[in-house]
Each structure stands twice: as C-alpha cells, then as structure tokens.
Amino acid sequence: MVDGEDKIKLIIIVGPTASGKTELAVRLAERFDGEIVNADSMQVYRGMDIGTAKPSPQLRQRVPHHLVDIVTPDVNFSAADFRREAAAAIDDIHSRGKSVFVVGGTGLYIRALLQGLVDSPSGDESIRRELVELAQTVGNEELLRRLALVDPETAERLHPNDRLRIIRALEVYRQTGRPISTFRSEHGFADTYYDCLKIGLRVERQELYRRVESRVEVMIEQGLIAEVEGLLRAGYTPDLKSMRSIGYKEICAYLAGECTLDEAVQLIKRDTRHYAKRQMTWFNKDFEINWVEYPESFATICNHVIEFFA
C-alpha cells in the first residue's frame, strides 16, 4: 500500500485533438517547474512529425518532453509499452524534484498508466450522482463506513478525504454486487502510485471542427506529403500500424494514385473529426476529469494546480 501523502502527484491534461493540450501543458510546466510525459500513441514515432502534430522543437526546448520520438515507425508500440516507459519517465522526473504533467488524447494509454489494462465495470451516471448527493448529506466518514460494510479491503486502503474513490467503490458494488477489490485481485492490479488531478479541455463542437480543418490544411502546407514520401522511401510500408493512422493512410492512397489530393485532404478532415468525437465519448465517461474552457480559464486552471500541490 502507498499512503496518499507518499504518492507521486500527476497533472493529467486530456481532451480531443486540436483542443490546445500541448500549449496548455507547456504553460503549466513552465509555471510549476515541470516536465511533460507524452500520452499520444502516434507521437512516439520518429520521423512522423507533421501528421501527428508533434510539439515543435521550440516548445520542446522550453519544456522537456518525454516519450516523443522514442521508436521507429515499424515498431508496434502498445499500451503496455507506454505504461512501462511512462512509469520510468515519471519516476525520473519526480526523483529530480520536478512536477509531472501527463498530456495526450489517447485515453487507453492514460487508463493503462493509472488502472492497468483490464476493463473494470463501466460507470453508471445515475448511481454516481446519487452517491455524490449522499456524500454531501452524510459526509465522507459515513460514506467510508458504509463501504467498509461491503468491501472492507478497499475501505481499509482509502482515506476519508478520498471521496472520488470511495464513491467509485460503492458504485461498482451497487452495479455488480461485488466489491471492487475482487476485480483488482482477479487482475493483479497493484495500488496506484499516483495521485492525480485530471484536467479536460472542452471546445464547442463547431469550433473544434473548424480547428481540425485548419490544422489539416496547415499540415499539407508544412509538407505532410513530403513527410510520407520520405517514410515510404525509408522502407516503411503502408500496411504498418503507424502508417495506417489518420493522415498517413490517406496520403499513402493519394501517392498510390487511389484518390486525388483534394479527396485525401477531405478524408483526413472527416476522419479527424470522427476521431475527436470518439475521444470525447471516451473522456466523458471519466467522472474525475475537471472540464475547463481554454485559454479563457488559464487562471482557474492554475488555481486548481496550486490547490492540488498544497
């Protein structure tokens, strides 16, 4: 067991593509003497810069970024690989007395880091809302006492102030009739070594889609076609997992004469919009995320971080 006071504190910044995560992370890391751990499944690949919207060299000079450019495009980098590499990077950053910011839109990677790789029961919003109201009425101590009656193992690990996890444990029991500790023991999950503040960037849908379309056009202007041509010349074939990602597969099709450039660009825009929608569906299921508007709420976000570190 790791006591709450001994856990490494992580600031986790999530949101859909083109929502401004990287810029926010850099500003916060500069403000709070931190370093960034990338949680984007495509930015790990060397030579795939434009199509992955990788942080610019200028941003990476301002703040150290980890798990960027760590493997070649022919490596099948997995969530398990990410979990291992991210944990090592977090330990390194923490050991040097720096704040840790985990930033990205790959929800599976973030879940792998925090919870392991086996699904726990999905959340039930109505049960969660009822338990939140109960906590406000009876208080955390009583809520923890009630958890101890049905799941003493989990209750023993939790502090009364850890309201979110108490509610989550009660929610799982109400849903399944089983203590959450039985899911943990079945899958061999260890107690997480992290204490997390999750910040999500919310962007109005039409504005997000406008940003997506603008970003795709900028990628073409910056040389996405030449980037893909270079990857193909280097021997990275279109059937690789990395080359089948959004932006690369469409340009590969264009270069193979399977569609026009305009058709490829329209497909990239469409597929990126769909991806952003899937990202929001994923993150909306996480009740621990504090959703904010950015950049309007930067001061509010800073206050959240200050309170978290206090």
From Swiss-Prot:
Region feature (Interaction with substrate tRNA): 40-43
Keywords assigned: ATP-binding, Magnesium, Nucleotide-binding, Transferase, tRNA processing
Pfam families documented for this protein: IPPT
Residues annotated as binding ATP: 15-22
HAMAP family: IPP_trans
Alphabetical GO biological process terms: tRNA modification
Top-tier EC class: transferase
Subunit field text: Monomer.
Signal peptide start-end: none
Record-given protein name: tRNA dimethylallyltransferase 2
Catalysed conversion reaction: adenosine(37) in tRNA + dimethylallyl diphosphate = N(6)-dimethylallyladenosine(37) in tRNA + diphosphate
Reported cofactor(s): Mg(2+)
Family, per entry: Belongs to the IPP transferase family.
Protein function: Catalyzes the transfer of a dimethylallyl group onto the adenine at position 37 in tRNAs that read codons beginning with uridine, leading to the formation of N6-(dimethylallyl)adenosine (i(6)A).
EC number: 2.5.1.75
Native organism: Geotalea uraniireducens (strain Rf4) (Geobacter uraniireducens)
Molecular function via GO: ATP binding; tRNA dimethylallyltransferase activity
Annotated binding of substrate, by residue: 17-22
UniProt-annotated site: Interaction with substrate tRNA, residues: 106, 128
